[in-house]
């Protein structure tokens, strides 16, 4: 007998095959109205921005941003923070977004995880001052989940927030990303989306996450803004301490002169 996940994967393939034309039509309409299509390479091909969004699409989706949630998430984030402040980058390369990879132990394959990890590392090396946020949908949620876990401490500290839609590792990882701050992760699992329950059964609810784009963008924007406030506060505290130290040093210098330079 074939493993349960293999049987479910076959059923899901049929479901996704039927849904793809509808998703493509919706994506084309969205791109014409708002601008972001199924591919975005603003980190790789553009200049550094204050914020960089790294996104991994779901299985069988087009481009490197997909159609269901990637493009509207990008546009909503730009709307909240400023279109000139945000660079959107989809995960491509070795990440082919194939279906069979969902049945692997990490719900994706090592090459896909490596492709996402490289995007985070490129953001860090090319734009060391950018604030990184990330998102993933369906298999892409597993790609981002696993990639963030593998980041060095330096790069991971640059990641301010993550949103995961139709999280395929929701059960295994307890609704969070291991070894990453739980408060900086928001998981979206629609009622009736069985993918979030450790199955590979794709229902209609798995295709509804576009409606969460605004809320998810607000979450990421808040994480970016709160990290900026923390940085400003730390800088102010450091400046105050430096000023106080300078005053103390001046006083000691005066005493030193008075006593002949002890």
Curated annotation (Swiss-Prot):
The active site is at 138 (nucleophile), 193, 206 (proton donor/acceptor). One of its GO terms (cellular component) is extracellular region. GO terms for molecular function: cutinase activity. The keyword Transcription does not apply. Disulfide bonds join 48-127, 74-88, 189-196. Residues 228-262 are annotated as: Disordered. It is found in: Secreted. GO terms for biological process: carbohydrate catabolic process. Keywords: Disulfide bond, Hydrolase, Secreted, Serine esterase, Signal. Its EC number is 3.1.1.74. Coiled coil: none annotated. It is an enzyme of class 3 (hydrolase). Belongs to the cutinase family. Catalyzes the hydrolysis of complex carboxylic polyesters found in the cell wall of plants. Degrades cutin, a macromolecule that forms the structure of the plant cuticle. This is Probable cutinase 1. It comes from Aspergillus niger (strain ATCC MYA-4892 / CBS 513.88 / FGSC A1513). The lineage of its organism: Eukaryota, Fungi, Dikarya, Ascomycota, Pezizomycotina.
């Amino acid at each position: 007998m074939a493993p349960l996940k293999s049987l479910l994967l076959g059923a899901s393939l049929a479901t996704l095959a039927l849904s793809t034309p509808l998703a493509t039509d919706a994506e084309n309409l969205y791109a014409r109205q708002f601008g972001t299509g199924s591919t975005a390479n603003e980190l790789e091909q553009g200049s550094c921005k204050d914020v960089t969004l790294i996104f991994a699409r779901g299985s069988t989706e087009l481009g490197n941003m997909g159609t269901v949630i990637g493009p509207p998430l990008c546009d909503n984030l730009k709307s909240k923070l400023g279109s000139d402040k945000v660079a959107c980058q989809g995960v491509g390369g070795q990440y082919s977004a194939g279906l069979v990879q969902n049945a692997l132990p990490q719900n994706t394959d090592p090459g896909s995880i490596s492709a996402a990890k490289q995007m985070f590392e490129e953001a860090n090396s090319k734009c060391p001052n950018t604030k990184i946020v990330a998102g993933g949908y369906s298999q892409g949620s597993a790609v981002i989940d696993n990639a963030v876990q593998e980041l060095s401490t330096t790069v991971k500290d640059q990641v301010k927030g993550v949103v995961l839609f139709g999280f395929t590792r929701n059960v295994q990882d307890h609704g969070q990303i291991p070894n990453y701050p739980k408060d900086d992760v928001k998981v979206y699992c629609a009622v009736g989306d069985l993918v979030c329950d450790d199955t590979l059964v794709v229902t209609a609810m798995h295709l509804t996450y576009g409606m969460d784009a605004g809320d998810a963008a607000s979450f990421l924007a808040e994480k970016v803004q709160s990290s900026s406030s923390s940085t400003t506060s730390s800088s102010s505290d450091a400046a105050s301490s430096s000023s106080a130290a300078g005053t103390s040093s001046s006083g000691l210098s005066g005493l030193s002169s008075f006593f002949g330079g002890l």
